[in-house]
Every structure is written in structure tokens, then in C-alpha cells.
């Protein structure tokens, strides 16, 4: 598989400087699994110069490919669940923060007519703390948007990778149909000896059939 066919893979080029350690770890693991799966596909396309050799490589790499798909699925699911949890937590914190802010404002307005100079100074400190909390919330929302963007990019990666796997399987099925046609012609060559031709064709067909349908 050439480099031009991997233009969709972000790999280590994504910017995660503002991301959480958990997200960085998850993305690194996802990149590693993606690289391994691409390596398996490359091995089939580069070394499978014949139908038999390609069938053998597919058979040997099938367990590894299934294992990588399972790990990729778990990483993708974990990332989606984490994203959903952050969305809900952010929404709850925002509602709680707004409710608390309204209560504080009402309290400050009521106390303003009766407060002394000392109480007025305390009120100023509370307003400063409120502004600091609002800035913190903005930073958290910005980080969440970044993580959501990266999540969408990784989702596209998984979709394109599965599309490539389907393409490889389709090509393999097409080669099998061509092979069946040539096997039939081979049997016809032994038509002068019906018994011998039948025995040889049956043995060869059984051998190739077991290889092809063991996937």
C-alpha cells in the first residue's frame, strides 16, 4: 500500500499539547494499532504475488488482524464514553455554576444597601473569584472542543480503515472466482481418463477449498 493511500492517517502529526494525559495515551495506542493493521494489509498486497501465497498470508495473519480490530474497537468505545462523560459533567457544572452565581448576585444586591465599607471590600473579592471561575470554565470547554475534534478525526480514520479491509476481501473473492474457472479447465484436460481426472481434480479442489474457506 503506497504512502499516497495513507493520506487520511494523522499519526503523530496531530496537536495534543492541550490535551489530557488520558487522551494522549489513548491516541498513541490508537496510532500504534492503526500502524500494525496497515502493516498487515501491506504484507498481503506486497508479498502476495500469487493466489496461493496470498491465501497463506491471509490465513496466517487473520488471528492478528482480528485481535487488532478488537483492541481498536475497545479504544474507540472508551474514547466515545469518556467524551460523553465530559459533556455531561461540563453541562452539570455549568448549570450549578449559573445557579450559584444568581444566588450570589441576589445576596450581594440585598447586602449592598446595609453593608459597611468592610463588607463592600469582601463583595469585591467575591466578584474577582467569580471571574476566575468563569475563565477556568472557558479553558475546560476549549480543551473539550479540542478532544471532540480529535475524536471525530479518529472516527474517520477507523471508517476508512474498515473500507480498505472490505476492498481487500472483495479482491480476494474475485480472484477465487477466476481460480475456480481455471480449475474447471484443468479437469477437462483429463477427460480422456475420466477416473484419473476425477480423482486428481477432486483432491486438488478439496485442498484449495479448505484454504480459501478457512477465513
UniProtKB/Swiss-Prot annotation:
Could you identify this protein by its name? Protein NETWORKED 3B
Q: Which gene encodes it?
A: NET3B
The record's keywords, sorted A to Z, are: Coiled coil
Q: Where are the transmembrane segments?
A: none
Regarding protein family, the annotation reads: Belongs to the NET family.
Which Pfam families is this protein grouped with?
KIP1
Subunit and partners: Interacts with F-actin.
**Coiled coil listed as a keyword:** yes
InterPro entries named in the record: NAB, NET_actin-binding_domain
Q: What is known about what this protein does?
A: Plant-specific actin binding protein. May be part of a membrane-cytoskeletal adapter complex.
Record-linked PANTHER family:
PROTEIN NETWORKED 3A-RELATED, PROTEIN NETWORKED 4A
NAB domain residues: 5-90
Keyword 4Fe-4S: yes or no? no
What are its GO cellular component terms? membrane
Stretches assigned to coiled coil: 134-165
Q: Which GO terms describe its molecular function?
A: actin binding
Amino acid at each position: 500500500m503506497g504512502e499516497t493511500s495513507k493520506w487520511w492517517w494523522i499519526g503523530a502529526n496531530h496537536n495534543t499539547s492541550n490535551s489530557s494525559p488520558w487522551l494522549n495515551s489513548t491516541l498513541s495506542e490508537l496510532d500504534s494499532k492503526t500502524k500494525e493493521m496497515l502493516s498487515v494489509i501491506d504484507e498481503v498486497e506486497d508479498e502476495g504475488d500469487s493466489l496461493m501465497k496470498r491465501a497463506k498470508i491471509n490465513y496466517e495473519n487473520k488471528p492478528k488482524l482480528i485481535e487488532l480490530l478488537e483492541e481498536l474497537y475497545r479504544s474507540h468505545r472508551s474514547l466515545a464514553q469518556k467524551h460523553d462523560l465530559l459533556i455531561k459533567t461540563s453541562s452539570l457544572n455549568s448549570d450549578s455554576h449559573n445557579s450559584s452565581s444568581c444566588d450570589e448576585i441576589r445576596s450581594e444586591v440585598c447586602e449592598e444597601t446595609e453593608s459597611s465599607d468592610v463588607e463592600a471590600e469582601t463583595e469585591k473579592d467575591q466578584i474577582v473569584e467569580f471571574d476566575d471561575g468563569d475563565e477556568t470554565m472557558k479553558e475546560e470547554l476549549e480543551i473539550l472542543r479540542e478532544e471532540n475534534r480529535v475524536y471525530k478525526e479518529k472516527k474517520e480514520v477507523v471508517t476508512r480503515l474498515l473500507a480498505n479491509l472490505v476492498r481487500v476481501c472483495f479482491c480476494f473473492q474475485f480472484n477465487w472466482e477466476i481460480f475456480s474457472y481455471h480449475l474447471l479447465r484443468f479437469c477437462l484436460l483429463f477427460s480422456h481418463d475420466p477416473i484419473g481426472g476425477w480423482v486428481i481434480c477432486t483432491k486438488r479442489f478439496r485442498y484449495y477449498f479448505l484454504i480459501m474457506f478457512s477465513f
